[in-house]
Amino acid sequence: MTVRREVKAIGLVSGGLDSTLAVALLKRQGVLVKAVNFYTGFCITETQRRKGGRPDGTVPRNEALRAAADLEVEIEYVDISDAGYLDMLVHPRYGYGANANPCVDCRIFMMARAKEIMEREGADFVFTGEVLGQRPKSQRRDTLRIIERESGLDGRLLRPLSAKLLPPTIPEREGVVDRERLLDISGRSRLRQIALAKEWGILDYPQPAGGCCYLTDESFGRKFFDILGQREELGEERRIAREDVVLLSTGRHFRLSPRAKLIVGRTEVENAILEGFAEGRARLEVRGVLGAVALVEGEPTWEARVLAARILARYGKGKDAARVEVEWREGDLVETYAVEPERDEGRIEALRI
C-alpha cells in the first residue's frame, strides 16, 4: 500500500475571513499548515494594541493569533519592519496605490520572506487568502502573476480561494493538492466566503472591511509624503525610519514651514510617546496648565517657533487665556515664549497635514 507523504504549506494569515478560509480549505485536504503573520509597523489595529487601545478605550485583539488558535495551527509572528521594508516603501518598483500604499511591492516583499520560511521548514508551497479581482491593484490577474514571479515563488504560490481561475501551481500539478477541491471565487462580494464560513462552523471572524493598513489612509499618506518632502527641502536622504512610522500615526501634524513640522499629542498615551522621541527634536509644553506635549522637527525659524507655541496653546486648559507661557526645550537650550493661543481655526486647518 502506498502511504501518502505529509504535505506541508506556509500560509499568510491575517485573521480575516479569506485567509481563515484558505487555511481551513487546505486542512480539509490533510495539508499540515504553518501560519505566518507579518508585522510591518503599519497595521492600524496592531498599532492601537501597542499604544494601549482604541480612542474609545477598547483594545483590539490580534486576529491572526486568534484565528490560528481556533484553527489549531502553529503560527509564527514575523516582524519585517526593518530597513529593507522601509526602503521598499520609499522606492517601490511598481508604484503606489491611491495613497502611500505600494501594495504590489509589499506583497512581493512578504512572499519573498515567506519563501525563506518555506525553505527553512521544508514545506511544499506558500498560500494566501487572496481573491482574484477583490482589490484593484494587488489582486488583478497580471499583478498576482508579477508577485509570484518577483518573489521567487514561481509555481509554488497557491491562492486556494481562486485557484480554479488561475493556472495550476506545482503542488496542484504534482497532485499533493487536489485542484478539484479548491475554489473559483472572484470579485469583491464576500457572500460565498460568508456562506462557507457558516457551513464549516467558522463563526468568529472580523467583519470584512478594508482600511487595516495606515498606508491606504488618505490622512496618513499626506503625512508620509510630507515628511519625505521636508527631508528633500533640508537636503537630506529621501527615507523613512522606524521612529517615523510611530510618529506618523501619533498626534496632530502641522506644516509650520517647508523646513519645520509640529506634532501635538491628543491623549496622555500620545504625549508619553512624543516624550520618548524628544531627543533630536524640540519639545514644547504649556507651563502651569494641563495640556498637550508637542515636538517640532526640522529647522524652524523664529516665526515658526512662535506659531508652534500658539498652536500648542490652543490644545490645552489655557486655550481661553489671554496669554500662556510655552516652554521650548531643545537639547541644552530652554526658552519660554509668552503667546496668545491661536484662535483662527481656518489658519490651523490650513496648516494641518
Segments and roles (model prediction):
Residues 156-353:
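AMP-forming adenylation/ATP pyrophosphatase catalytic core
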Residues 1-199, 333, 342-343, 347, ...:
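ATP-dependent adenylation/nucleotidyltransferase module used to activate substrates
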